[in-house]
UniProtKB/Swiss-Prot annotation:
Binds 1 zinc ion. Its cofactor is Zn(2+). GO terms for biological process: regulation of DNA-templated transcription. Interacts with GyrB. This is DNA gyrase inhibitor YacG.
Amino acid sequence: MNAITTIKCPQCRKETTLAGNPYRPFCSQRCKMIDLGTWADEGYRIPGEKAPESGGEEPGDE
């Protein structure tokens, strides 16, 4: 059984094949670079309370 596995690109939602795709899980280099740019700009965040600002001292520093 040689079923072709297809997935949706996480960026543009276009159907793409998994096997033989050098940009997987993305459909193209463009979508891969858009996602990388979002990571670099800290566009992906976990929801929650903002972390307190550090005063430059780490716990245990005396």
